Amino acid sequence: ATGIEWEEYAAGAEYAAEHGELLQPGALDAIEEYGWALKGPTATPIGKGFRSINVQLRQRFNTYANLRPVRTLPGVPTRFENVDLVIVRENTEDLYKGIEYMLNDEIANGVKLITKPACERICRFAFDYAAANGRKKVTAVHKANIMKLTDGMFLSTFREVAKDYPAIEADDCIIDALCMKLVQKPEQFDVLVAPNLYGDIISDLCAGLVGGLGFAPSANIGAKTRIYEAVHGSAPDIAGQNKANPSAILMAFAMMLNDLGMTDKAARLNAAILAQVAEGKAVTADIGGTATTTEFTDAVAARL
């Protein structure tokens, strides 16, 4: 037992279809009051409809840093054996600010909003994380060769902040070149810090390097609020069928336990997940098994 008392609230497209609103009343107030939340995957319509709940939560609570650890796991089929990197994604700005409008019937415009305070805040977060967790290098991800003002500001701010951390190696990589290098030799990277859009894209790419989104947890971190979740989406094609791999949300919960100071419980939960996957029995279909979500979760729980 963790000693955590839970309050549960519904959210997402299915809830909205029935109730006309994205979040059950009281959810935002509860997050505001407690400052900690574990969030399940929610669907967002493509090309129309309401804005992403994730984006709204991040902007409402100013959870400016999205922390996404990526590492190779024993028992998970992958092309790479020694991946161990962390993505630090700026969570509140860039094209994900959601500022879009029609100039006329044939021209749509989206605003890429980048501010120096947000750039400095996320870069400093990345270096502080590296220093606190024994990481040796931080790489800035950008396209400053083309977007000289927006990404240029991100890169120049990164270089300014890096001067305050002489013990940590700092370099940068253009986003398209980074994608190539990640699929060639991912072990060359340690901590990647990126604006919102690039961070989102490389998060999924890196998850693919270690076996897929089923093993990708994340934490949305602000000054007063932390929201933990799986990187993957709601997978509507298997929703309600008891087929999904719950590892990512369990690993996100382990991140939460660790940040709450329950480091022993976090380590035990992570070890139980890894042991279950490595054994290869009672695992879900995405990694070659036949177990249901419930069966996998029960097997992990039995190891605790």
Model-assigned labels for residue ranges:
Residues A1, N104-D176, Q188:
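Glycine-rich phosphate/diphosphate-binding loop of Rossmann-like nucleotide-binding domains
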Residues T2-Y15:
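A short beta-strand-loop structural module common to alpha/beta enzyme folds
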Residues G3, E33-W36, R58-N66, E93, ...:
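Generic secondary-structure signature for well-ordered alpha-helical cores
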Residues A13-A16, P25, K181-K281:
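Glycine-rich phosphate/nucleotide-binding loop
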Residues A17-K112, L197:
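N-terminal glycine-rich phosphate/adenylate-binding segment common to multiple enzyme folds
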Residues D286-L304:
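Short, amphipathic C-terminal "tail helix"
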